[in-house]
């Protein structure tokens, strides 16, 4: 009987020793703990670490996002963006939970507007304008060339030729045509669009100079407006000039306004003729020029 009691006591002591030696989860952390991302960029890969080393093997990890409509996370911890653009930055908190421990990664998700500076032309023209053309990495680059209503660039920056996306027969009936009179259909960041008819008329009014007799003060006032808009020479492509742009002394960008016969209004500034600004109402469908976005 005493042997039985001894053996039972020994077994209990051994079991207690095993339980005492079983490792416990001490710390849990997510890498990176914070990150910033623009909506067309790749989200970071998350790495979950814990102490003691190896403690997570075989354990259940529960992943959650507090804004899954913006950034979702899978059961195995892979992030995915659910939006293509945002008007305002959003903070998304990703949480990993294991037993009684949690770890978080705070993501700041920014829209495409984060790549631009905003020039306030309200006092002069009645609206704000971005500091560069769509697709330009800096304010001194030309950016992308677009046919009106075609959201795929047909050339970029200093390209000498158009690419395979160019369509000499492009029109409103073409597959993929987007009505750029609606801001949400344009290549602009969310909340921005192409200049409307009223905005184009404001540009025309504030930058008009007579061919003869303009005063020094009038010339200086127009130059100040154009300088503030930070315009860069662009040139253009069309079906007659798909290999080699028209002169780079011209600054061109599209408006939201449709003209006659499938044409569209465009801004044009010729640096070679003393700084004359033109609102051209005959931008043809085969024409490819940059996009500059505005907002009231």
Q: Locations of the language-model features?
A:
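Low-complexity "stalk/linker" and mucin-like segments enriched in Ser/Thr/Pro/Ala/Gly
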Residues: 56, 64-79
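Solvent-exposed, low-complexity, repeat-rich "mucin-like" stalks and linkers
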Residues: 29-59
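Short strand-coil-strand connectors
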Residues: 53, 66, 97-101, 123-125
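Bacterial Sec-dependent N-terminal signal peptides
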Residues: 2-10, 15-35, 99-117, 296
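A short beta-strand micro-motif common to beta-rich folds, especially ectodomain repeats
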Residues: 87-100
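Extracellular/luminal low-complexity segments enriched in Ser/Thr/Pro
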Residues: 77-89
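Extracellular/surface recognition and adhesion modules
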Residues: 48-50, 63, 94, 107, ...
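C-terminal, surface-exposed recognition/capping segments
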Residues: 21, 113-115, 123, 127-156, ...
């Amino acid at each position: 009987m005493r042997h039985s009691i001894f053996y039972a006591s020994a077994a209990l002591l051994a079991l207690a020793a095993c339980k005492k030696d079983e490792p416990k989860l001490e710390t849990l952390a997510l890498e990176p703990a914070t990150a910033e991302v623009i909506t067309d960029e790749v989200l970071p890969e998350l790495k979950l670490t814990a102490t003691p080393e190896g403690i997570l093997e075989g354990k259940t990890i529960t992943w959650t996002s507090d804004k899954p409509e913006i950034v979702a996370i899978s059961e195995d911890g892979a992030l995915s963006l659910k939006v293509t653009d945002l008007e305002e930055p959003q903070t998304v908190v990703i949480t990993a939970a294991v037993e009684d421990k949690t770890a978080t990664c705070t993501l700041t998700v920014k829209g495409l507007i984060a790549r631009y500076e905003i020039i306030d032309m309200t006092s002069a023209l009645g609206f704000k304008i971005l500091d560069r053309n769509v697709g330009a990495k800096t304010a001194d680059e030309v950016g992308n060339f677009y046919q009106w209503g075609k959201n795929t660039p047909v050339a970029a920056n200093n390209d000498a030729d158009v690419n395979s996306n160019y369509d000499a027969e492009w029109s409103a009936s073409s597959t993929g045509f987007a009505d750029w009179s609606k801001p949400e259909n344009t290549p602009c960041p969310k909340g921005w669009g192409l200049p409307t008819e009223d905005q184009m008329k404001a540009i025309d009014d504030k930058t008009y100079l007579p061919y003869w007799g303009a005063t020094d003060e009038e010339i200086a006032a127009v130059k100040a407006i154009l300088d503030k808009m930070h315009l860069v020479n662009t040139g253009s492509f069309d079906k007659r000039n798909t290999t080699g742009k028209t002169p780079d002394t011209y600054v061109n960008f599209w408006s939201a306004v449709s003209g006659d016969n499938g044409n569209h209004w465009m801004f044009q500034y010729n640096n070679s003729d003393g700084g004359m600004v033109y609102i051209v109402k005959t931008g043809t469908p085969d024409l490819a020029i940059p996009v500059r976005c505005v907002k009231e």
